[in-house]
C-alpha cells in the first residue's frame, strides 16, 4: 500500500514539472516590449473613439431637469420606464432645475424661459387620436380641465396662462437662476379613456410632459430648448395610495431573486429627457397641419413600447391667442348652393355643412383611390383622421361598420363619418312643394293670374312641383331656396308675399313660415317691383 502511494506522488510531481516547463516559454518569443497596452490604446482608432464618446457625453447633458415629488411604483422591471401613480385633483410639485454647466447657454443669463406642462397619452395609438379623445372627455365633463396649475402653492412662476381650447396644457415663464416649483393637478383618470366592456379594465397610462422654450429674435418664446416626460397613471382620490400599497405588498411576497428583476421605489420621479426627431408627414397632412411639430424619440425602434415618446408641442405663437369665431355663412347671387362651404377644421356633428355636402351628391365611391379618399376626408371635415386612413381606398372605408367607426373615431365623429359614408341627409324641419307660374309683368297692385284647377296651369300644361326643404324656418330661407331651385338671382328678390283672402298680399315673415303646415303646396309668380328694381315673389 505504501508503495502504491509513493508511486502516485512520483507521477504527480512529474506531471507538474512537465506542465510548468511547457508554460515557461510562452510569450518569450515576442520579447518583453512587444505587447504594451499603453501602446495599443495610443492607436488612432482608440483616440477617435474616446473623443467621440466625450462629445456624446457632452451632448447628452441636458440644460434643465424636472423632478416630480411623487413616488415611483416598485412593480416596474429593471429595464422598463418608471411608472408613477397620482391621485385625481391632488397637487403635485414639479421642481424646475437649472442643470447647465458653467458657460453653457450664456444667452439665457438673466433671461426668462417659457415652459409648457401637458398631460398627454402614452400609447402611440391614442396620441394620433388625441384631439378626438379630448373632445369626447370635454363633452362628458363640460367646464372641467384635464390639467390645472395650483398657483398659490407654486413658487417662482410668472405670467401663468391656460387656453380654453387646450384643456390639457398650462404655460408659465420662469427664471432658471431662481428656485422654481410648479404644482399641478390632473383631473382626468386613466379609466376614462378605456373602452367599457365588462368592467375592471385597466386604465390607460398618461405622460406628464414639460417643453421649455427661449425667446427668438422677435421676443417670442418659440425656440425649443428641452423636453422631458414621465409615465403616470391617475386614479380617483386616494386610489393611487392604495395602488402603491398593493404593489409594495406584492413585492414583499416575492423572493430575493425575483426582487432583483424590479426597480426599487424612489421618493421622487425624474422626468426623462427625450431626443426629438421630426416625423416626415405626407402632403395631405402637411397641408392640414403646416405648423405642427409631431416628434418621435431618436431611439424609436426598440424602446418605444417601454419608454413612450414626447408628444408634439402646441404651436407657441398662436397656441394662446383667442381666435375670433368664424363669420356666419353668407349668400350671394354667384353662390347657387344652399349654404356656404364649412371650415375643414370644424368637427361639430351639428354643423350645417353636412346638408350641403350630401345635397351636392358628393359621396365617396368604392373605386376611389387612397389619394381620393384622403381628399374626401378633408372636404367632409375629417382631416384629423387622414393619417389613420392613409392606406384606405374608398372600398376599404365603405366596408367599415358603424361599430368599427365608433371604436376608431369615438362616438361623435364615428357616427358622423358613418352617416357621411352612407349619404344620410339631415331630416328637414319643414317641407313645402312649389310650382312656378309663367312670369307676369303685372304690377304688385294688379291681380296675378289665377292658378288652374286640377293640378294644371292656365295653359293646360301639367304643373311640376319642386320640393323645398327648410332647415331654418325663416322667411330669408324660403327666398334663398326658391332662388336656388328656380335659378332666380337672389339679390333681385325684394320681398316674398303670400296671397290671402280676396287676393290681398301678405308679407311672409318668420312667424308665418313657422306656422306653415308640412308638405303644403304653393304656386308662385314673380312680379316687378314698383320702381322696376328687382322682383317680388307671390305664393298662392
UniProtKB/Swiss-Prot annotation:
GO cellular component, one term: cytosol
One GO-annotated biological process of the protein: angiogenesis
Localization (cell): Nucleus
Modified residues (Phosphoserine): 22, 390, 393
Main subcellular localisation: nucleus
Residues annotated as domain Grh/CP2 DB: 60-296
Protein name: Upstream-binding protein 1
Assembly description: Interacts with TFCP2 and PIAS1, and is probably part of a complex containing TFCP2, UBP1 and PIAS1.
Additional comment: Present in both domestic and wild mouse strains. Recognizes the genetic difference at position 299 in the SDI-A1 element.
Amino acid at each position: 500500500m505504501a508503495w502504491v502511494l509513493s508511486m502516485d506522488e512520483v507521477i504527480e510531481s512529474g506531471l507538474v514539472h512537465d506542465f510548468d516547463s511547457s508554460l515557461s516559454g510562452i510569450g518569450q518569443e515576442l520579447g518583453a516590449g512587444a505587447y504594451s497596452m499603453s501602446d495599443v490604446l495610443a492607436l488612432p482608432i482608440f483616440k477617435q473613439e474616446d473623443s467621440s464618446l466625450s462629445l456624446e457625453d457632452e451632448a447628452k447633458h441636458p440644460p434643465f431637469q424636472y423632478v416630480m415629488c411623487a413616488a415611483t411604483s416598485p412593480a416596474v422591471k429593471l429595464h422598463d420606464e418608471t411608472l408613477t401613480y397620482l391621485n385625481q385633483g391632488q397637487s403635485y410639485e414639479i421642481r424646475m432645475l437649472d442643470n447647465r454647466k458653467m458657460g453653457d447657454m450664456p444667452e439665457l443669463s438673466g433671461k426668462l424661459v417659457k415652459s409648457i406642462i401637458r398631460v398627454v397619452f402614452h400609447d402611440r395609438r391614442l396620441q394620433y387620436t388625441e384631439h378626438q379623445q379630448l373632445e369626447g372627455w370635454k363633452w362628458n365633463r363640460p367646464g372641467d380641465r384635464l390639467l390645472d396649475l395650483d398657483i398659490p402653492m407654486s413658487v417662482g412662476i410668472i405670467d401663468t396662462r391656460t387656453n380654453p381650447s387646450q384643456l390639457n396644457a398650462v404655460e408659465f415663464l420662469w427664471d432658471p437662476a431662481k428656485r422654481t416649483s410648479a404644482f399641478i393637478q390632473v383631473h382626468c383618470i386613466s379609466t376614462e379613456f378605456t373602452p367599457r366592456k365588462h368592467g375592471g379594465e385597466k386604465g390607460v397610462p398618461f405622460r406628464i410632459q414639460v417643453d421649455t422654450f427661449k425667446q427668438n429674435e422677435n421676443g417670442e418664446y418659440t425656440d425649443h430648448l428641452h423636453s422631458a416626460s414621465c409615465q403616470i397613471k391617475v386614479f380617483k382620490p386616494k386610489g393611487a395610495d392604495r395602488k402603491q400599497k398593493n404593489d409594495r405588498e406584492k413585492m414583499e411576497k416575492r423572493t430575493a431573486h425575483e426582487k432583483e428583476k424590479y426597480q426599487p421605489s424612489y421618493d421622487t420621479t425624474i422626468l426623462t429627457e427625450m431626443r426629438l426627431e421630426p416625423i416626415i408627414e405626407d402632403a395631405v397632412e402637411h397641408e392640414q397641419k403646416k405648423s405642427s411639430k409631431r416628434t418621435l424619440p431618436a431611439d424609436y425602434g426598440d424602446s418605444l413600447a417601454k419608454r413612450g415618446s414626447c408628444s408634439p408641442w402646441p404651436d407657441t405663437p398662436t397656441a394662446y391667442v383667442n381666435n375670433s369665431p368664424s363669420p356666419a355663412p353668407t349668400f350671394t347671387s354667384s353662390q347657387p348652393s344652399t349654404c356656404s362651404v364649412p371650415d375643414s377644421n370644424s368637427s361639430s356633428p351639428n354643423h350645417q355643412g353636412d346638408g350641403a355636402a350630401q345635397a351636392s351628391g358628393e359621396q365617396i365611391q368604392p373605386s376611389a383611390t387612397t389619394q381620393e379618399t384622403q381628399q374626401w376626408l378633408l372636404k367632409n371635415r375629417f382631416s384629423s383622421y387622414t393619417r389613420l386612413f392613409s392606406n384606405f381606398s374608398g372600398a376599404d372605408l365603405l366596408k367599415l361598420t358603424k361599430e368599427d367607426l365608433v371604436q376608431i373615431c369615438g362616438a361623435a365623429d364615428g357616427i358622423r363619418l358613418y352617416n357621411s359614408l352612407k349619404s344620410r341627409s339631415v331630416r328637414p324641419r319643414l317641407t313645402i312643394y312649389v310650382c312656378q307660374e309663367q312670369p307676369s309683368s303685372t304690377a304688385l297692385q294688379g291681380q296675378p293670374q289665377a292658378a288652374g284647377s286640377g293640378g294644371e296651369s292656365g295653359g293646360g300644361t301639367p304643373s311640376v312641383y319642386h320640393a323645398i326643404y327648410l332647415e331654418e324656418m325663416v322667411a330669408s330661407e324660403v327666398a334663398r331656396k326658391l332662388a336656388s331651385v328656380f335659378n332666380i338671382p337672389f339679390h333681385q328678390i325684394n320681398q316674398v308675399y303670400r296671397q290671402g283672402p280676396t287676393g290681398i298680399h301678405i308679407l311672409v315673415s318668420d312667424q308665418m313660415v313657422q306656422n306653415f303646415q308640412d308638405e303644403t303646396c304653393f304656386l308662385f309668380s314673380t312680379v316687378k317691383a314698383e320702381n322696376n328694381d328687382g322682383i317680388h315673389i307671390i305664393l298662392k
